[in-house]
Each structure stands twice: as C-alpha cells, then as structure tokens.
C-alpha cells in the first residue's frame, strides 16, 4: 500500500483505522488537487451522506438538522474548501461553534507535495482556484497559508502524493469504512437467453449444456428453486465439475476487483428461459461464492415467472 500519514492527536506512520465517535460527522478539507472528489466518492460507496462545497457558516445548521434524523443519515461527511472563497475564512469559527454546541466531529485533511499538486492541475488543464493571474504554484502557496491552522488541528492528515485514484479510495476505505477492507458486492443473476443478455453482466455462465428439466413432465411446472429440479440439474453429468472450475476461475478476478477498489459485480447465469437450469446453478454458485472473504453475495432471478 502507498504511504500515508494518519494523525490522531499525534502523527503516526501508516494507516490507522480511526475509531468513529458516537456522532458521525466528518469534515473533509485540504489542498485543491489532493483528492477530495475521490475521497468523497469512496465515502459515499461506504454509506456516508456527502455534502460538497458547503459554506462553513452552514455547518452548524446542517449538523443540527441531521442530529434530529440519525437513523436516516447516520454518517455525514461535509466537504469544505477554498472554493467558497471569502466564506472559507470563517472555518475555524464554524468548527469552534460545533464544539461549543456539543457536536462531535472529526476533520480529515488531504494534502500532497507541491510538485504533485502542480502536475495534477497541469494534467487536468485547470487553474488553481486561488492563483488569479499568477502561476499554479502561487495559488498553492496562498492556499497552504490559508489552511495552515486547519491542518495543524485536523484529526487525520492524509498525504496523497504517492496515491493513484484506487490507492486513495482504498486508504479512505480502511480509515472510515465500518467494514474495514474493501468488500465486493456480487450479484449472481439467473436469466433466460431468449429474453436477452443482462446489460450489466460482468461475467456470463451458460447453463444450456445441462439436460433441460422442461422435457421432464413432472419437473416442468416447477422451477430451479424447487428441490427436485435442483437435484436433477446439479446431479447431471459434468455440472459439479463446471461449478467447481467456475468458482476457482473467479477467485483471482474477484481478488483483482477488490484491489482495484471495485465494489460491485454481476455474474449472470443463463439457460433458455431462465426457469430451471440457470436458477439452480445460480443458487449453487451463490452458496459457493459466499464463502469467499470480503465478498457479499446476493441472488436474483431476472426472468423467473416470466413464462
């Protein structure tokens, strides 16, 4: 993992998970170009309600509103930065008012080396919000001075100089996710080929090589959710080997998805009508894949009942 600094009271080397207080309010700030947008996206992926570019004077009002609906918005992240121009000068006053009112919060400060920030602005072909008619580096210098006191009092200072987008998202996950390391949500979906391929499928497994229960009169009215049909499908020659090999083949792919900070994937299992074979195989694959670490499996049957 890329290096970062997590500071809680005193600065420490490496990433230390930050134990959340009772009130889940996180103020996200830091240098322009240090990755606030990526951090916001990562927080949203883990259930945080994110408000971007909020004037600091509105922090107390928003926190008060959310405090009356903790079940609706249990985790609130507010992004405040120099884009609010003159309004940002009141940030310390606003944070002091939060503390005085008894609202518990944390401050995440994202930072990066000047040369890295300059390169990111140049690559994005965007001016620094404070550079005016000067250079990007001039704007960075002004911003550092404006944010100096805020950085000194931040609960977490995260240096993103060595991070790419995925590395930063992973760091945010480790620091602020209730579940810790990245969890992949895998939806195993049965479907019928005659109704078309699922447009959101990352993988497609074809179960049409299995003998079709449709041609067995006593099984035809039932579905792959019924035990008799499931036993017939999963007991057919080659099916268990197919399932075993498919699960093994997916293991490095799912590991890679997590490393790339991908949170969602869909495995589609198809047969002709989506009633018998694909349903039974999807259920078996779901059971096997649910044993993977940090994989949450759901099962859906797109075309079941469509006939």
From Swiss-Prot:
InterPro entries assigned to the protein according to its UniProt record, in alphabetical order: P-loop_NTPase, RapZ-like, RapZ-like_N, RapZ_C
Positions of GTP binding: 81-84
Ranges that cross the membrane: none
Keyword field: ATP-binding, GTP-binding, Nucleotide-binding
UniProt entry tagged with the keyword Acyltransferase: no
Region called Disordered, residue ranges: 1-21
A molecular function (GO) term: GTP binding
Residues annotated to bind ATP: 30-37
Role summary: Displays ATPase and GTPase activities.
HAMAP family: RapZ_like
Recorded family membership: Belongs to the RapZ-like family.
Designated name of the protein: Nucleotide-binding protein AAur_2084
Organism annotation: Paenarthrobacter aurescens (strain TC1)
Upper taxonomic lineage: Bacteria, Bacillati, Actinomycetota, Actinomycetes, Micrococcales
